[in-house]
C-alpha cells in the first residue's frame, strides 16, 4: 500500500495562534475518510466528513454533481474562497491516493477485482482543558478491520496483520510518522483552536438534558424502568441505575448516544425490576450542562384528586336535576294541553315519547 497523502495538505494558518485560552473542557477534531471500490467502474466512491466535537462541519462526496468540500455548519461558512478551494483540492488528492491504495491492497490480500472493498481512515487531535494537545490519532482500516494505526507516542505504528506490515515498513522508511506527528501537534491543534473560536456559540455551549423515568410492565411480576435523557449537548453523558445505592451496570440495557436532528442528543438506560420494588431503584445522570448530578426515581401515577364517592355524589345530583327538568316540562305541557283541546293533546302525548326532543317538537306549532 502506498504512502498516504501528506497530512500537511490541510490549509495552514497565516499566522501562529497564541495557545493561552482556557476551554470549558476537552475538545476534538476528526476527519473520517472512506473509499469504496465498485466493480465495473474505474473510480471508487470517496466520502470525507469533518467533525469538531460532536458537530459535523464539512463534507466531500466524489459522487456529487460537482464534487467540492462543502460546509455543514454556519460558523465555518465565514472561511474565505481560498479555504474552500484548498480543501476541495486536498480531498480530491486523497480520493486518488485511496484509489491507488485499494488496488494495492488487492495484491496484498490476493483478492480479485470482482468484489467491492473499502478503505477507511480517521485522523485528528484532542485538546485538553488547557488548550494543548491531549492525544493524536491516525488510524486505517481495510474491509472493516483494523489495518494500521499510529501509536500514542506519535512516533511508531502498529500493524494488524502481515499485509499491514508491508505498509508499516514503507511508512517507516519514508518517515511518515514524523510528518503525521507534525500535522497533529501543529496544524490540527491550530485549526481546532480557530474553529472553536469561530463557532464558540455552538461548540462551547452546554445544554443540560431533559430527564424522566418511564415504567413498562413486562409480565405479572416484572417491569422495565427506562431512564431518559433528551436534548443535551455535548454528547458526552453518563446514565447509571442503582439498586439500594449499588450500581446495576451489569444488568442495564444502555443504548448508544444518538443525535436528535437539531444539534442535540438523546440516550436512555433501562433495567428490569420485580414489580413492587421500583422504589428501590434510582437513575443517576451526569452531564456537563448540569450544575450537579441528577437522581431520578419512577413516580407512580398520582391518585385522582376527586374521590370516587365524590364523583358518585355529583352524578347523583346531576341525575336528579335532569329528572326534575323532565318532570317539569311534562307537567307544563300537560297543563297547556288541557287548555287547548283534544287534537293538540294527542300530539303532545305522541311527542312526549321522544324524550329530550319534547321541547323542540312543542315549538313547531
Swiss-Prot record:
Under which name does UniProt file this protein? Class I histocompatibility antigen, B alpha chain
Similarity comment text for this entry: Belongs to the MHC class I family.
Q: Where is this region: Alpha-1?
A: 25-114
Region annotated Connecting peptide, chain positions: 299-308
Q: Which residues are glycosylated?
A: 110
Locate the coiled-coil region(s) and give their ranges: none
Residues making up the signal peptide according to the UniProt record? 1-24
Keyword annotations of the record? Disulfide bond, Glycoprotein, Immunity, Membrane, MHC I, Phosphoprotein, Signal, Transmembrane, Transmembrane helix
Q: Which residues face the membrane's Cytoplasmic side?
A: 333-365
One Pfam family assigned to this protein is C1-set
Q: Where's it mainly located?
A: membrane
Which residues are listed as membrane-spanning? 309-332
InterPro entries, sorted: Ig-like_dom, Ig-like_dom_sf, Ig-like_fold, Ig/MHC_CS, Ig_C1-set, MHC_class-I_related, MHC_I-like_Ag-recog, MHC_I-like_Ag-recog_sf
Q: Where is the composition biased (Polar residues)?
A: 346-359
GO cellular component assignments = early endosome membrane; ER to Golgi transport vesicle membrane; external side of plasma membrane; extracellular space; lumenal side of endoplasmic reticulum membrane; MHC class I protein complex; phagocytic vesicle membrane; recycling endosome membrane
Identify the domain of life.
Answer: Eukaryota
Extracellular topology ranges:
25-308
Disulphide bonds in the chain: 125-188, 227-283
Q: What does this protein do?
A: Involved in the presentation of foreign antigens to the immune system.
Where are the Phosphoserine modifications? 356, 359
Amino acid at each position: 500500500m502506498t504512502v498516504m497523502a501528506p497530512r500537511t495538505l490541510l490549509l495552514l494558518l497565516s499566522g501562529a495562534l497564541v495557545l493561552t485560552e482556557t476551554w470549558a473542557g476537552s475538545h476534538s477534531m476528526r476527519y473520517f475518510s472512506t473509499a469504496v471500490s465498485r466493480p465495473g467502474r474505474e473510480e471508487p466512491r470517496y466520502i470525507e466528513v469533518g467533525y469538531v466535537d460532536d458537530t459535523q462541519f464539512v463534507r466531500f462526496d466524489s459522487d456529487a454533481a460537482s464534487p467540492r468540500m462543502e460546509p455543514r455548519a454556519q460558523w465555518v461558512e465565514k472561511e474565505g474562497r481560498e479555504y474552500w478551494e484548498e480543501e476541495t483540492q486536498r480531498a480530491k488528492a486523497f480520493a486518488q491516493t485511496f484509489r491507488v491504495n485499494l488496488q494495492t491492497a488487492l495484491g496484498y490480500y490476493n483478492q480479485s477485482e470482482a468484489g467491492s472493498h473499502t478503505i477507511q481512515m480517521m485522523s485528528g487531535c484532542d485538546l485538553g482543558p488547557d488548550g494543548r494537545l491531549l492525544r493524536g490519532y491516525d488510524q486505517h482500516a481495510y474491509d472493516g478491520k483494523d489495518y494500521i494505526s499510529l501509536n500514542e507516542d506519535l512516533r511508531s505504528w502498529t500493524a494488524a496483520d502481515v499485509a499491514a506490515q508491508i505498509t508499516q515498513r514503507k511508512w517507516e522508511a519514508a518517515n511518515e510518522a514524523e510528518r503525521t506527528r507534525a500535522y497533529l501537534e501543529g496544524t490540527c491543534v491550530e485549526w481546532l483552536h480557530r474553529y472553536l473560536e469561530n463557532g464558540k456559540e455552538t461548540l462551547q455551549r452546554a445544554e443540560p438534558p431533559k430527564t424522566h423515568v418511564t415504567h413498562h410492565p413486562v409480565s405479572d411480576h416484572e417491569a422495565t424502568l427506562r431512564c431518559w435523557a433528551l436534548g443535551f449537548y455535548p454528547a458526552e453523558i453518563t446514565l447509571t441505575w442503582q439498586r439500594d445505592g449499588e450500581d446495576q451496570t451489569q444488568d442495564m440495557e444502555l443504548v448508544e448516544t444518538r443525535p436528535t436532528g437539531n444539534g442535540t442528543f438523546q440516550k436512555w438506560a433501562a433495567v428490569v425490576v420485580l414489580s413492587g420494588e421500583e422504589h428501590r431503584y434510582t437513575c443517576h445522570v451526569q452531564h456537563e450542562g448540569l450544575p450537579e448530578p441528577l437522581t431520578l426515581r419512577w413516580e407512580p401515577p398520582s391518585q385522582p384528586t376527586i374521590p370516587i364517592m365524590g364523583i358518585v355524589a355529583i352524578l347523583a345530583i346531576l341525575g336528579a336535576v335532569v329528572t326534575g327538568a323532565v318532570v317539569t316540562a311534562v307537567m307544563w305541557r300537560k297543563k297547556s294541553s288541557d287548555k287547548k283541546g283534544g287534537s293538540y293533546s294527542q300530539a303532545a302525548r305522541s311527542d312526549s315519547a321522544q324524550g329530550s326532543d319534547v321541547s323542540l317538537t312543542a315549538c313547531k306549532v
